Curated annotation (Swiss-Prot):
GO terms for molecular function: ribosomal small subunit binding. One of several proteins that assist in the late maturation steps of the functional core of the 30S ribosomal subunit. Associates with free 30S ribosomal subunits (but not with 30S subunits that are part of 70S ribosomes or polysomes). Required for efficient processing of 16S rRNA. May interact with the 5'-terminal helix region of 16S rRNA. One of its GO terms (cellular component) is cytosol. It is found in: Cytoplasm. NCBIfam families: PRK13815.1, rbfA. Its main location: cytoplasm. Transmembrane segments: none annotated. This is Ribosome-binding factor A. The keyword Nuclease does not apply. Belongs to the RbfA family. It holds the Pfam family RBFA. Gene3D superfamilies: 3.30.300.20.
Amino acid sequence: MVKRSDKVGEEIHKIISELLIKGLKDPRIGFLTITGVKMTPDLRQATVYFTVHGSDEDKKNSEAGLNSAKGYIRKEIGQALKMRFVPEVLFKYDTSLDYGQHIESILKEIGATDDGEQS
C-alpha cells in the first residue's frame, strides 16, 4: 500500500524539478539534481534532498539559492497541489552519492592490493 505522504512527496519532486528547468533564474543555483523528497506523516514539512555537480562552493551557493527561492517554490507547490496546508520546504544536500563514491574508492583500493598480493 502506498502512503499519501509518498504520493505527495513524488508530486513535490516533479514540481520542483520542473521549476529548476523553467522557473528559477537564480545564478547561484548550479547544475543540481533533486534526489528525493521526504514528507512528514502530517504532510506539513517536505525535506528535499539534492546533489550538485561541482565544488563545495557550488554546493553552498546552490543551497543558498534554493533557500532564497523557498517562498516562490512553496507558492508554486500550493498552486499545483491545492492542499489545505502547503508543506514547509527544507533543502538538504544529499550525502549518499558522496558516501557511495567513497565506498567505491575503498573497494577499488582493496581490489588493487589483492591483485598485488596474488602476483
